[in-house]
Curated annotation (Swiss-Prot):
One of its GO terms (molecular function) is structural constituent of ribosome. It holds the Pfam family Ribosomal_L27. This is Large ribosomal subunit protein bL27. Residues 1-21 are annotated as: Disordered. It comes from the Bacteria. Keywords: Ribonucleoprotein, Ribosomal protein. It comes from Geobacter sulfurreducens (strain ATCC 51573 / DSM 12127 / PCA). InterPro entries: Ribosomal_bL27, Ribosomal_bL27_CS. PANTHER family: LARGE RIBOSOMAL SUBUNIT PROTEIN BL27M, RIBOSOMAL PROTEIN L27. One of its GO terms (cellular component) is cytosolic large ribosomal subunit.
Amino acid sequence: MAHKKGVGSTRNGRDSESKRLGCKKFGGETVKAGNIIYRQRGTQIHPGTNVGCGKDYTLFALIDGVVKFERLGRDRKKVSVYPAN
């Protein structure tokens, strides 16, 4: 057994709190206006029809409806909310 702590061990032992990013509502789910759909850093997914974008790039529903993830060109994605019929 070591009688000294070892060089690294006293400098370790920290970790940042998780930011809880990612998808909060999936395709086909019904949402109400104001519901958060996606939390992200930067625009991984762009806002589509009836979806707003917050200052931290959080995507949220502007109307009640159904979530649909779509392609925006060849290399981008967008999320839209369409009214549920």
